[in-house]
């Protein structure tokens, strides 16, 4: 399960979830000119089999325009610090795995 964290989520989250979510990246660590555009992030995720995780509704719009892959997880849990977001993701690991493995689903909102 490969998650690509958008710039609006701290890169520090990777260390907090690495045991349960290996092979994740933050957009600041991908080989694109920074700051990468949403389209560039989308294309990287598509070419490298990542699911994008973000607070940004712009990826929902891209998903509706382009379809999958990649899949998109939108965090609707605003005003949470990185540790709280990590705790939420760890608690919802089974839901996230099920979403990624279900070929019919395109978007997951996590509250």
Where are these regions (language model features)?
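N-terminal first-folded block
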Residues: 3-47
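Acidic, metal-binding active-site segment of PIN/NYN-like and related structure-specific nucleases
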Residues: 49-63
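Residues at secondary-structure transition points
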Residues: 32-39, 57, 80, 84
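C-terminal structural segments of small proteins and small subunits
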Residues: 70-111
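Absolute protein N-terminus
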Residues: 1-2, 111
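Glycine-rich nucleotide phosphate-binding loop and flanking beta-alpha elements
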Residues: 11, 59-61, 81
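Glycine-rich loop at the start of a catalytic domain that most often binds anionic cofactors/ligands
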Residues: 64-69
């Amino acid at each position: 399960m490969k998650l690509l964290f958008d710039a609006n989520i701290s890169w520090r989250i990777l260390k907090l979830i690495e045991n349960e979510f290996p092979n994740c990246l933050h957009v600041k660590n991908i080989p694109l000119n920074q700051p990468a555009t949403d389209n560039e992030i989308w294309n990287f995720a598509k070419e490298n089999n990542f699911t994008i995780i973000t607070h940004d509704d712009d990826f929902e719009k891209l998903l509706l325009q382009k379809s999958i892959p990649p899949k998109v997880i939108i965090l609707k849990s605003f005003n949470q610090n990185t540790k709280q977001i990590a705790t939420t993701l760890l608690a919802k690991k089974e839901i996230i795995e099920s979403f990624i493995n279900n070929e019919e689903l395109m978007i997951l909102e996590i509250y």
